Amino acid sequence: MDPKEIIKQQRLFFSSGKTRNVDFIIDKLSNLKQKIIENEESINNVLYRDLKKSKFESYISEFGILISELDNYIKNIKKWSKRKKVRSSLLNFPSSDYIYSEPYGAVLILSLIHI
């Protein structure tokens, strides 16, 4: 598929609002984590072939960090995505002010696959 078409499809999907659902994000992150774990051996082989990284080094510098970050994100995303009350300015009195955390948009990551 053409990269321009992929970007177009991703922007359409983002504008649908589905990515604002925290449960949707958790599901996708869990799927990503599972796929990484399922393909660990293949990824280790590529890291050894291309960068001469041992399995231990691959785990320490690649898998361990990535899986830990995914676990942390899955665990905390509900808390991070809640609105946060902030102090109101005198100019806005009387008001209630909040910060809403929302996704910015779509990202396209291109990579060569050597599996």
Kindly label every feature range from the protein language model:
Residues 113-115:
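Conserved small/polar residues in nucleotide/adenosyl-binding loops
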